[in-house]
From Swiss-Prot:
Note on cofactor: Binds 1 zinc ion per subunit.
Matches recorded under PANTHER family: ANGIOTENSIN-CONVERTING ENZYME (PTHR10514), ANGIOTENSIN-CONVERTING ENZYME-RELATED (PTHR10514:SF44)
Regulation: Inhibited by captopril and, to a lesser extent, by lisinopril, trandolaprilat, fosinoprilat and enalaprilat.
Gene behind the chain: Ance
Subcellular location: Secreted, Extracellular space
Lineage of producing organism: Eukaryota, Metazoa, Ecdysozoa, Arthropoda, Hexapoda
Name of this chain's protein: Angiotensin-converting enzyme
Task of the protein: May be involved in the specific maturation or degradation of a number of bioactive peptides. May play a role in the contractions of the heart, gut and testes, and in spermatid differentiation.
Protein species of origin: Drosophila melanogaster (Fruit fly)
Modification note: Glycosylated.
EC numbers, comma separated: 3.4.15.1
Amino acid sequence: MRLFLLALLATLAVTQALVKEEIQAKEYLENLNKELAKRTNVETEAAWAYGSNITDENEKKKNEISAELAKFMKEVASDTTKFQWRSYQSEDLKRQFKALTKLGYAALPEDDYAELLDTLSAMESNFAKVKVCDYKDSTKCDLALDPEIEEVISKSRDHEELAYYWREFYDKAGTAVRSQFERYVELNTKAAKLNNFTSGAEAWLDEYEDDTFEQQLEDIFADIRPLYQQIHGYVRFRLRKHYGDAVVSETGPIPMHLLGNMWAQQWSEIADIVSPFPEKPLVDVSAEMEKQGYTPLKMFQMGDDFFTSMNLTKLPQDFWDKSIIEKPTDGRDLVCHASAWDFYLTDDVRIKQCTRVTQDQLFTVHHELGHIQYFLQYQHQPFVYRTGANPGFHEAVGDVLSLSVSTPKHLEKIGLLKDYVRDDEARINQLFLTALDKIVFLPFAFTMDKYRWSLFRGEVDKANWNCAFWKLRDEYSGIEPPVVRSEKDFDAPAKYHISADVEYLRYLVSFIIQFQFYKSACIKAGQYDPDNVELPLDNCDIYGSAAAGAAFHNMLSMGASKPWPDALEAFNGERIMSGKAIAEYFEPLRVWLEAENIKNNVHIGWTTSNKCVSS
């Protein structure tokens, strides 16, 4: 009995000590979160200065400050080991401590960390500074990706001109950084192992807090693949009509330079030559925006109005004062790739975008403002929770609004779409146009990370790195480069996110769940009823819906304080990511395409590409 009593007293003493420690830990975290917000703000300011004016001095400053923060994070990780946080009662404290033990690249030794920052800066800077010569004038060599090269790739229908720009860009944006990329993979792997992951792939996937996540995506993609193959077959059939058999084969992969986008990630720019009913208008309000004197400022004001119409948060004054929404004309180099920034203070949020007055850019504005709304909704949370429920949630928010903005119903409402008659043919045109962005993107997005996972996991011999990239693009997307590539080339970093070390799975996840969000928001707004043909999902406008806004608020204000299924549940009662909503949205198109492809004897699927040879 005495022994039992002593054991009980010892247990009570330990428990009391733990309760006491938990109170201290709470206070420690409160102070630490404030300090981290302050320090991250300084780092973000330096990154902003560099991204909006690429100079050696700004790069040096940015990297020095990042190194300082990394050092501090190491000290924090060391401090957290002094707490027995895994035994605490509070799930919230456990979650915060767990987040703080993930050091990422800061786990690297100082020299390696500095080298990694230099390597990433070199790749990002190379990408931002690419200039090529004019196809028709070899003395004019100042064409940048944004806007000049992208303009040609989207508008030109001369396949030789397109192939020229494709090769020039990939050679300069990709091949030029092969050695840096190899070193980046080595350092990424080293950091992952120091964080107790087997590779960088597992480190990235850990953000989704689900061991089966990779398999779930494979399964969802397998469900969507038949629709993608129908779209691919139909587009190839129409491109053959336009360019002829010598340029596009009947059964092979599609030459990617013909698809209106440098990376063939979305094909809506070639809608004019592949749209199902060419005599019916396609929704493109770019010309009307020009005619009505739209400016980048007006586009952002409209986006702000959409959020506030749903009772969500208005853009703060700091946003208008500090954002860069047009390409500066003073000749400086900057990263033009649209991005949204959180400075971890109160109401200091910004966008950097070289905005052009086009329909597509109007949607991009809403996408970026979705990030900003998320920042504003969770800014009351402790620093460690000031991020998305998972990376895909952050990307999806603005896209839900873009799906709504792009409907004929909304564009008519705001006076940009005139004399539009929505019959069955116009509807198929519109669904097809949306699919060229939303369905076509899925295999592309998957391959961006499947490729890097394979390098991080050491599954591909270095001698085959380039052809491994094209093999995946062929296998998943059925596209190929316009010219033969070899291991003398290195093409993956010609995509910004690969040069800049941005995980890409977030976009795949976003393109799936945004349809889940959209469907639920449309039902809440009384804009979609599966049993009412007058209220279809593909013409639902959630503008002005306080009910949809409240659902967004419930989810966004949680930040990362709970695992993402809890955030999804707060929005619509579901806990599982599913491809059902995206299938529902495109069902009328699937039915039409299958019949049309059979009628035209269109080949579905593609033979293996021979456009990359391992030397």
